[in-house]
């Protein structure tokens, strides 16, 4: 009888381990696959795709759009009549916040990375692609300020201004499965999702502590 109890315990433990193992593989925890290139021993992560199913590429222009009904694209705005606009907002389906969004480019420290594919959970810098004055030319890179607000004024190469992209399980009303969330991933700190919040009457992009709280985004080639 004792041996039967031990066997039952081992079978139950194995079953629970398999369940936990299976749950660990989802779009939130993408499987790292080996490269198909025989001369490349590096491991690669899945590609990030735009709304039309094309891989995102470093240096190309995109609109970051929230596909949910009533939501809209991300844009640069000037709050408080500053010399350089620095607020990162989200358009909404209400008159004062209607719009088409401001194009962005994803960049890395090395200019030689231009044209490379963007992969999930790899660090990138996000930069608005806008006409600007000499005074504001270095004020287009995203960062997160001390209030947890996404603003511009970051620097390419500053490890505290790194963002990453993660796949979600969401599907757009049109049926696209290429829906992602953004994360702010400063050096030596845990990544935080990018969510949304009204602050002083404006729909701001903010960091959030709850892993289940985030804004969904699709990327539209501009």
Curated annotation (Swiss-Prot):
GO terms for molecular function: cysteine-type endopeptidase inhibitor activity. A motif (Vacuolar targeting signal) lies at residues 29-34. Tuber. Residues 27-42 form a propeptide. GO terms for cellular component: vacuole. The keyword Signal applies. Residues 1-26 form the signal peptide. Keywords: Disulfide bond, Protease inhibitor, Signal, Thiol protease inhibitor, Vacuole. Gene3D superfamilies: 2.80.10.50. Belongs to the protease inhibitor I3 (leguminous Kunitz-type inhibitor) family. Putative inhibitor of cysteine proteases. Does not inhibit papain. May protect the plant by inhibiting proteases of invading organisms. This is Cysteine protease inhibitor 9.
């Amino acid at each position: 009888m004792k041996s039967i109890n031990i066997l039952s315990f081992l079978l139950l433990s194995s079953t629970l381990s398999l369940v936990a193992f299976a749950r660990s593989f989802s779009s939130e925890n993408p499987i790292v696959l080996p490269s198909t290139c025989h001369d490349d021993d590096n491991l690669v992560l899945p590609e990030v795709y735009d709304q039309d199913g094309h891989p995102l590429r470093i240096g190309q222009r995109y609109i970051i759009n929230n596909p949910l009904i009533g939501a809209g694209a991300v844009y640069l705005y000037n709050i408080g009549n500053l010399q350089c606009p620095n607020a990162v907002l989200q358009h909404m389906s209400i008159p004062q916040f209607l719009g088409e969004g401001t194009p962005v480019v994803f960049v890395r420290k090395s200019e030689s990375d231009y044209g490379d594919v963007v992969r999930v959970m790899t660090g990138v810098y996000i930069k608005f692609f806008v006409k600007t004055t000499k005074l504001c030319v270095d004020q287009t890179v995203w960062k997160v300020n001390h209030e947890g607000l996404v603003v511009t004024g970051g620097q390419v190469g500053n490890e505290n201004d790194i963002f990453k992209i993660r796949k979600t399980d969401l599907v757009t009303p049109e049926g696209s499965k290429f829906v992602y969330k953004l994360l702010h991933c400063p050096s030596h700190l845990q990544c935080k999702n990018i969510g949304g919040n009204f602050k002083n009457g404006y729909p701001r992009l903010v960091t959030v502590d709850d892993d289940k709280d985030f804004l969904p985004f699709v990327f539209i080639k501009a």
